[in-house]
């Protein structure tokens, strides 16, 4: 735990000021000035308290030793087991820039469209359970260098004939992609991490454990080799899009598929950095059903896997069905053509409602 040099109070990372704040005397400090000592800067490890859920086995860690009384992964309300441990130091971190209140506001805005969600998910006490967790990521630096030859063609019509000229387009490639990121935690579902992406890696800062004060961090248990091919493939997609849409070729169109351009990129992974990215995390548990709401701690982007309240669903269906029944019986004679049109309108409304809900 970080203590205030002025009064001995607890220091936490304050998102609004991007500095360390004393909870007692309100003094601010630079996170990098609260030293672990010069030897610690060269160390590959740092001290943490690891909290383990006795029910699901999920682990989070913190530089604080305060008691964690619920699990963010399975939603269990239980005191987590704790132990002192050492963790490998990340190279970089993206500090939280969205406060808990920002996070709650974004979540409430999304929940206005969640008509069939259980009312508990809109309760202020429940929403206050958002927990700030730094999720581990691997950030890949991919380079593409060397000569490349692409095929192109240009067609023109003369009378009744179309003439096509074929070209070899020669160039030297020098592309650098830094910060292609994939989450490094098996407990953090890839679908969730993709839903709240991207992060702006230009705002990464050098890591110091002070950034974790007042927050938690997940442990990295997925090796960097798992996503190497995905990183190379993603870099290839970016190069293909750029070559296809941004390079002027004088009317010559590329005669190359995405896969062939990727194969000619000579991609190499230059380096892989261990990083931490900020996520506001909220879990909901009802019997065996666990649902999550996550907010990108840098951009405020929200993603949620929301359960459906059966009671609200049937109530909403009844409210919709009754006026339709009255309308059809009082004002229309049900003929095949009328019925077909009514069904088409209802289907269109249903599709619109469905699309609006799946984008939550």
Residue map of PLM features:
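Short Cys/His-rich micro-motifs in 6-15 aa windows
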Residues: 26-33, 74-82
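Extended hydrophobic
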Residues: 273-324, 351
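Short cysteine-rich clusters marking metal-coordination/redox-active sites
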Residues: 4-7, 22-25, 53-56, 71-74
């Amino acid at each position: 735990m970080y203590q205030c040099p002025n009064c001995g109070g607890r220091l936490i990372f304050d998102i609004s000021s991007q500095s360390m704040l004393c909870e007692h005397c309100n003094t601010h400090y630079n996170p990098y000035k609260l030293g672990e000592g010069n030897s610690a800067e060269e160390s590959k490890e740092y001290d943490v308290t690891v909290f383990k859920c006795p029910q699901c086995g999920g682990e989070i860690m913190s530089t604080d030793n305060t008691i964690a009384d619920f699990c963010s992964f399975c939603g269990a309300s239980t005191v987590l087991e704790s132990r002192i441990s050492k963790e490998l130091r990340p190279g970089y971190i993206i500090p939280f820039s969205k406060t808990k209140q920002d996070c709650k506001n974004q979540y409430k805005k999304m929940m206005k469209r969640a008509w069939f969600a259980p009312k508990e998910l809109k309760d202020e006490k429940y929403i206050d359970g958002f927990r700030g967790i730094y999720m581990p990521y691997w950030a890949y630096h991919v380079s593409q260098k060397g000569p490349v030859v692409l095929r192109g063609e240009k067609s023109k019509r003369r009378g009744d004939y179309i003439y096509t000229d074929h070209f070899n387009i020669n160039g030297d490639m020098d592309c650098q992609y830094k910060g292609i990121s994939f989450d490094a935690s098996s407990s953090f579902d890839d679908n969730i991490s993709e839903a709240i992406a991207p992060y702006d890696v230009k705002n990464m800062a050098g890591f110091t454990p002070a950034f974790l004060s007042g927050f938690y961090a997940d442990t990295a248990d997925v090796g960097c080799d798992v996503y190497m091919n995905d990183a190379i493939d993603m870099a290839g997609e970016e190069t293909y899009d750029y070559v296809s849409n941004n390079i002027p070729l004088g009317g010559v169109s590329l005669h190359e598929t995405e896969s062939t351009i990727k194969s000619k990129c000579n991609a190499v992974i230059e380096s892989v950095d261990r990083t931490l990215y900020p996520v506001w995390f909220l879990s909901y548990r009802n019997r065996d059903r666990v649902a999550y709401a996550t907010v990108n701690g840098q951009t405020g982007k929200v993603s949620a896997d929301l359960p459906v309240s059966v009671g609200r669903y049937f109530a909403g269906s009844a409210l919709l069905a009754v006026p339709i029944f009255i309308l059809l019986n009082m004002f229309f004679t049900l003929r095949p053509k009328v019925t077909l049109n009514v069904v088409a309108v209802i289907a269109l409304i249903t599709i619109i409602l469905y699309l609006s809900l799946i984008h939550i």
